[in-house]
Amino acid sequence: MKMKMILPMMLIAALPLGADAQNKSGLVMSNLDKTVKPADSFYQFATGGWQKNNPLPAAYSRYGSFDQLSENNNKRINTILSELQKKTYKAGTIEQKLSDFYKLSMDVDSRNKAGIAPVKPLMDEIEAAKTKDELQKLQVKYAWMGLGLSYGAGFAADEKNVTMNIYNLMQGGLTLGAKDYYLNNDAATVAIREAYKTYLSKMFQLYGFSADEAAKKASAVFLHETTLATFSKSRTELRDPQANYNKMTLAEFKENYPNIPLEALANAEGIKSEYLKEMIVGQPAFFAGYDKVAAAECASTLKALMEWDIICSSASYLSDEIREARFEFFGKTMSGRKEDYPLWKRATAQVDAQLGEALGSIYCKRYFPESSKKMMEALVKNLQISLGQRIDAQTWMSDATKKAAHNKLDKFYVKIGYPNKWTDFSKLSIDPSKSYYENVMACRKFANDKEIAEKAGKPVDKDEWFMTPQTVNAYYNPTTNEICFPAGILQYPFFDPKADAAFNYGAIGVVIGHEMTHGFDDQGRQYDASGNLKDWWTAEDAKGFNKRADMYADFFSNIKVLPDLNANGRFTLGENLADHGGLMVSYNAFKNATAKKPLKNKDGFTPDQRFFLAYAGVWGQNITDKEIRNRVKNDPHSLGKWRVDGALPHIDAWYEAFGVKQGDKLFIPKNQRLELW
């Protein structure tokens, strides 16, 4: 594709990747499947060898290069934790907390001996309550745990006044996540629903109830969740930021939902009423429905719901029998996994989940060189310049909207590698004399108290990170207009300092472009340069954007991911726009960066071909059919295959690079190719 270079080349940052001419291609030839024409399935051509050489491990429902990198990261983290075991540390130090928590997570024998003992006092206290009033008093007593409450709550930026935090309420209460699992009647969904009923009953029995008692409690929970599903918003509907922003005063909330004792619960949790004067109620219709359900439900149902919440929050931290029962449903039935992860991996993941930033500080000192951060900073600068050029190239946009888009782009807050300041864990106590479950709950209570202390009535801290440094991922946050690239993702196959620009722009470059494009996707475009939910588009430009976005939604909705199942292009719209935009922006940046010193062919491929092969290589994976069904309902990203074979056929440069022509399976006529950014 011919690009117009709007900005002078001297503004492109010099990327410190060494002498590109001498750098390797970064490609692994055994990952390819050259028996397939690139134009018939580029995904298979670029990743078929990888798929063959990396069969799906029994513990995974999906295993791809993302997961492979995560596994390598887990080994690094496990090495850190194993080394910590070799010494004794003073109580209260971060090393003591990490070391003792890891020991607890590895101590299966103690958990198997204890059974449900760690949760039995709380379960008994709830079971002993005779009336609804007594149960509601227990809800207040344990308010921070949210027992029997079918909604989520917490402090976050006020999307129309993003310098301040505000109390947010959102729908919840569905153990299976998506409402579709409760309401759809296709054979696969019905089978999961029936298995869920069995699972509910089994878990109540494992927590000490008779078969008859368990059946009654399971029925109450299932009926409650099914009722909630009827007035819950779909995953797609939850993607509309304007529709999910509804500001209310506390007085209005009480009037609208008299059967939800929000103030009493919040006060008991440590939130003063003055911080509830205004709040955001994400889904008013859901809360109206839930208010009626809460009023009508009897004591026995509320009791079952409270007990079910305890079961859900503890099942992974008690005996193997209980953990395995949970895995049988969520791992095998829902996702198609054949076995659970080994103990060391589960333990490492839990330390990472509960004490991630403490671990991240050690991880970055050991595994993230400053040189990688500098290389990323240069890449990000080049991608920002390129996105500015892509904005200017959009002939359907007015100058006024382009100017506002540039303002937003210029104000991106970039985070790379690790936070500027680390979480203070001094108030968290990890007590090896207590159970694993009790220590997990101590971590959760610490995080909950920390959020209240730092956010209730307080300004937004733009330096807060929403991922740990060792996470293999990246994100864009609209309310701070930030793009974040943790140290964990800055490794092969996303980033290789010894590879040339074709590889790095095709891999990590597209990731950077992807996150930047999120600032201008169907959701992100509704937030201004400061992060406020505020319209900055002319009416005509907004219409033009929506017309183009609708075409993406329709295209991906027509993709069959299984013989009886289509993708949901409306649900995955933001991610599909970011994939396509990321490719366009990074390809343009790649051409900018190599204009004066074009790269040579390597390993039998041109520079442009290597760019697209690097991108596709990121998405190689093997996946079960059950996991495909699960992701179509719950994951806003397209499947790996379609992030390649769905995105690339809309990019002219890919056609030119691989000689794709009419008659090839992936060919789309030029006038039908989609473009937005």
Region annotations inferred by a language model:
Residues 1-22:
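Bacterial Sec-dependent N-terminal signal peptides
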Residues 13, 59-81, 213-231, 504-510, ...:
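Short secondary-structure subsegments characteristic of cysteine-rich extracellular domains
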Residues 22-30:
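Short, Gly/Pro- and small/polar-rich lid/capping loops
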Residues 31-52, 182, 186-205, 573, ...:
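Hydrophobic/aromatic-rich, well-ordered segments within soluble, folded domains that form packed cores
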Residues 37-40, 45-110:
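Active-site-surrounding "flap" and adjacent substrate/cofactor-binding loops of secreted or lumenal enzymes
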Residues 53-57, 153-154, 178-180, 232-235, ...:
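Short, solvent-exposed loop/turn and secondary-structure capping segments
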Residues 70, 256-259, 280-284, 348, ...:
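Intrinsically disordered, low-complexity linker/terminal regions across diverse proteins
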Residues 84-378, 382:
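Noncatalytic, helix-rich "gating/capping" subdomain that lines the substrate-entry/channel surface
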